Amino acid sequence: KIDSLQPWSGRESWMKYSPDSLYILYCKNHNLYVMGNKDKGQDSTEVQLTFDAEKNFTFAKEMDDSDGEVETVAEWFKDSKKIYAVREDARKVKDLYLVNSLSQPRPTLKTYKYDMPGDKEISQSELLVIDVETKKITKFNIDRWQDQYFEVLYVSKDSERIYFERTNRAYNEKELCVINVLTGEVKVLIHEVDKPFMDFKMVSISFLNDGKDIVYRSERSGWGHYYLYDGEGNLKNEITSGDWVAGPICEIDTVGRALYFYALGKDENIDPYYYTLCRASLDKPNSVEQLTFDNVTHAVDWSKTFNYFIDTYQRVDLEPHVVLRNRHGKKIMDLEKA
């Protein structure tokens, strides 16, 4: 007998509810639509918001043709009054082909758009903000480089600021920017040049206190390290520094103002490819504290209070061990062994 299943809520995967749950946003025939949530007493008549979309210039999350309702790339602002969308124009991009050899009864061919090095025409991005009530569409000027890459990173709680990053095609120069949704003004907060090529796998930008603090990873010193900026783009502090690599962030304690991250190559007694857990104050330079010391690689999960963490450590010749440690790295007890 199965009695643990929850009743179906009626929410389809293509439904993108506003934060106040009064409206539903979706895509149909590549365009944006909105309707009221009848469960909240709203008019469920669908209203079309855009009219210029088409295949490969769509608001759908997937670019394939679809006559029915599908999930959209557009997102709600927190005020539930506006939406924003980053739409890609891939109409001039060349096709790439993939054969599904597992298809039955015969293999099938999938065709899709794909940017490749050397192409003269690649995908172009645009940023739109739409007022759901008035249906006014505002297109913002986000261009800096030809054929740039563009990504929205954070939206302020008051729905008035959009933080985004734009990167040139050569991937050796980028800018962190904020746009004022009310005025359209774009302000560059951080401008970064890293030749010949940026490490895109280690890119890390965290917004704290609704954008008043920004934790930004850079290789400007020749080593990957974290820096603290204020909301205006002014450097406040070098969180980490030295001839070693500050790797992925584990957690950020916004109350205790501490950054927990994995270091590589910091301890000469540990393989530089292994993750070593460290803590650093956001506000005090040269305050990095190493929390794990064994010659193994670590993966940790912190408690909500940051008083304890579960540490899973292993090595190519050592099976995974799971232990509980306090905030200083001292082992409290063994939990599991593979």
Please report, for each region that a protein language model flagged, where it lies by residue.
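Beta-strand C-termini and the immediately following turn/loop, strongest in propeller blades
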Residues: K1, Y23-N31, G36-N37, T72-E75, ...
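A conserved hydrophobic secondary-structure block that centers on an alpha-helix together
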Residues: I2-D52, N56, W145, E151-V152
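Repetitive beta-architecture junctions, highlighting loop-to-beta-strand starts
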Residues: H30, S44, S125, K135, ...
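Short loop/turn segments that connect beta-strands within beta-propeller blades
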Residues: N37-K40, D131-K135, V181-G184, D230-N234, ...
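Predominantly five- to eight-bladed beta-propeller fold
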Residues: G41-E75, A85-K139, H328-A338
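Short glycine-/Asp-/Thr-/Trp-enriched loop segments that recur within the blades
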Residues: K55-E69, W145-F150, D194-M202, G242-I249, ...
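Non-catalytic accessory segments flanking enzyme active sites
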Residues: Y84-E88, V93-L96, K120-E126, F140, ...
